[in-house]
Amino acid sequence: MTLEGPFIYRLEYRDRCLQSVKDEQGCATKFAPPMTKVGFKLYIVCRLSVVLYVGVTNRPIRDRLRFGENPNGASGYHGYKWMDQPGPYELFIWNVKGGGDNQRMEIETLEAEIVYAVRAKIGQWPSGQTEIHFHESSNEDRRLSEEILATIYNC
């Protein structure tokens, strides 16, 4: 498995409704391939350089965000908890390439290692995190999670 990215966006929400998507320079934009394609992605939502949420999706990123914008609670899903905090948000996305049959498990392992590394760094789980998929990890998973967090904290 290799990761392509990060692709960095700034998001503005009002009442769980996406108002704007901006690139790193602050210019209005749209999500672009590979974020608009089906395929695994690791994504991290931050606010003021604080990690709020770490997630994995196989959907286009806009579809995944839209799902989190519209919680109904009836099926037990209450949407993204981080959307209850004021923005703007930074969205970091890595596109997953390769990985074969175990791609989901590999990216979920990395997701869990990043969440754990955030907890180790700040003493608390990310405030918007509501679930984690745990799998046995390797030294490479732990190294990569630290590298990803260094990228986020240095932006």
Where in this protein do the model-derived segments appear?
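Boundary/linker segments flanking structured domains
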Residues: 1-40, 46-52, 57-155
